[in-house]
């Protein structure tokens, strides 16, 4: 077991705690309305007697979308920090998992595509975290679309990769868990997108709830990589960073420890 096992758990714990903290700050600073509020008005008049605490009068501008929660300071500062640090951790997890599969002689187009989608997800998170929706709407929406779509593709591809590599009952149980998480992610992302396109306050609020479920679901999925990361070594990162054509392979008579790859053609699994 290595310290790398803490990386996926840290990503999940840090990000989930962070975005809920951002939400709590936004509610207390009256920048969004609570998720339990389903009543929205066309407009609200300022009430001088209403000091602190959640809003009692809400408009569509107060729907608690995750991005909306991180629009205004001070919560926007924490939101950007979460986006940037989360992106680095996501990219590192994707790279390590890619290298780990290469060590297992599982160099396939699915593994390569999963790496690309994971890194694309990380890039989208950087854009989302640093370009707030009220100040750079187009860039923020592009970043959100890229991050969410790439994140969904990443979890689906890794469901396939893990299922085909499962050998024990515990592996199969983890494969089923990840499949359930992938299905939940797909359903909530589709519903969030459909609801968001409508101007109905109820559907907009539903879009916000689906978005929260989607993001939490994806973060939990990333956390499950701790199951595999106990076997990661320093050679894993080397395997991931080596270019494909010149990847060194360990022969039976060689003392090289650059990778754990087996070069026998018949041992290379294509999925």
UniProtKB/Swiss-Prot annotation:
TM stretches of this protein: 3-23, 76-96, 109-129, 141-161, 179-199, 212-232
GO biological process: phosphatidylinositol phosphate biosynthetic process; protein localization to plasma membrane
Glycosylation sites: 37, 41
Alphabetical keyword list: Cell membrane, Glycoprotein, Membrane, Transmembrane, Transmembrane helix
Pfam families documented for this protein: Frag1
Membrane topology (Extracellular): 24-75, 130-140, 200-211
Biological role stated in the UniProt entry: Regulates localization of phosphatidylinositol 4-kinase (PI4K) to the plasma membrane, possibly by reducing the association of TTC7 (TTC7A or TTC7B) with the PI4K complex. Acts as a regulator of phosphatidylinositol 4-phosphate (PtdIns(4)P) synthesis. May also play a role in fasting-induced catabolism.
Protein name: Transmembrane protein 150A
Protein's gene: Tmem150a
């Amino acid at each position: 077991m290595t310290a790398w096992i803490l990386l996926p758990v840290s990503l999940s714990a840090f990000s989930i705690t962070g975005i809920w903290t951002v939400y709590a700050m936004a509610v207390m600073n009256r920048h969004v309305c609570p998720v339990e509020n389903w009543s929205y008005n066309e407009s609200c008049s300022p009430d001088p007697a209403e000091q602190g605490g959640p809003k009692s009068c809400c408009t569509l501008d107060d729907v608690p979308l995750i991005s909306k929660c991180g629009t205004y300071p001070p919560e926007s500062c924490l939101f950007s920090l979460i986006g940037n640090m989360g992106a680095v951790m996501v990219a590192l997890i994707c790279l390590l998992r890619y290298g780990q599969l290469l060590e297992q002689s599982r160099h396939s187009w699915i593994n390569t595509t999963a790496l690309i989608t994971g890194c694309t997800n990380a890039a989208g998170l950087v854009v989302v975290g640093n370009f707030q929706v009220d100040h750079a709407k187009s860039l923020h929406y592009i970043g959100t679309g890229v991050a969410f779509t790439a994140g969904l593709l990443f979890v689906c591809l890794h469901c396939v990769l893990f299922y085909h590599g499962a050998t024990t009952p515990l592996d199969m149980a983890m494969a089923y868990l990840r499949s359930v998480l992938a299905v939940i992610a797909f359903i909530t992302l589709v519903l969030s997108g459909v609801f968001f396109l409508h101007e109905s306050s109820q559907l907009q609020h539903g879009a916000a709830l689906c978005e929260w479920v989607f993001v939490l679901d994806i973060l939990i999925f990333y956390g499950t990589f701790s199951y595999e990361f106990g076997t990661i070594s320093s050679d894993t990162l080397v395997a991931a960073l080596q270019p494909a054509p010149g990847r060194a392979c360990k022969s039976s008579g060689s003392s090289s420890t650059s990778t754990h790859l087996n070069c026998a053609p018949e041992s290379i699994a294509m999925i």
